[in-house]
């Protein structure tokens, strides 16, 4: 029953997004369908030891954070990644899922070899304006700490 619900939900989302102006203008991208196994610090947090020196990593739909997990654990993996971050001076962060966007091709997708990125609004004390991070829950690549954040201890 749960599986049917997720399939119907995914169809609705994919149908709605495929007709958007942004999707029509940019077309479907691809991230190469990597499948790197992630390590857990604890049940709610990934181990993330690498710092990105690319200012676009996570901040653009062309260079999303790839946490993997798909329909079964993708949303949880997104939170596991975000739980591994702190502000640049050790501030705790807060995050809110804004929704999905930006269709792309992936062999790890649910239907028709496609997936959507999730957008999270992330904030911490001292940050002038909240930032939006783009996360891919279908493909899994080496996780990195985006510019402006630090590894949670």
Where are these regions (language model features)?
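Positively charged n-region of N-terminal signal peptides that target proteins for export
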Residues: 1-4
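C-terminal motif of bacterial Sec signal peptides marking the signal peptidase cleavage site
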Residues: 14-16
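Short, compact, well-ordered microdomains
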Residues: 109-153
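A cross-family detector of function-defining hotspots
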Residues: 99-109
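Post-signal peptide N-terminal segment of mature Sec-exported envelope proteins
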Residues: 25-46
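Short, non-transmembrane alpha-helical segments in secretory-pathway proteins
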Residues: 64-101
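Acidic/histidine-rich, surface-exposed loop or edge segments in extracytoplasmic proteins
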Residues: 55-67
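Bacterial signal peptide processing site
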Residues: 18-21
């Amino acid at each position: 029953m749960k599986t049917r619900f997720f399939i119907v939900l995914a169809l609705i989302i994919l149908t709605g997004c495929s007709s958007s102006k942004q999707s029509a203008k940019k077309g479907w991208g691809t991230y190469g369908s990597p499948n790197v196994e992630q390590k857990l610090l604890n049940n709610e947090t990934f181990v993330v030891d690498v710092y990105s020196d690319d200012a676009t990593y996570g901040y653009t739909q062309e260079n999303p954070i790839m946490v993997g997990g798909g329909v079964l654990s993708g949303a949880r993996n997104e939170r596991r990644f975000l739980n591994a971050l702190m502000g640049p001076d050790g501030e705790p962060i807060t995050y809110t899922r804004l929704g999905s966007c930006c269709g792309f091709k992936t062999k790890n997708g649910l239907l028709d070899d496609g997936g959507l990125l999730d957008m999270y609004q992330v904030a911490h004390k001292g940050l002038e304006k909240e930032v939006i991070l783009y996360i891919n829950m279908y493909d899994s690549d080496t996780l990195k700490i985006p510019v402006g954040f630090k590894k949670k201890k």
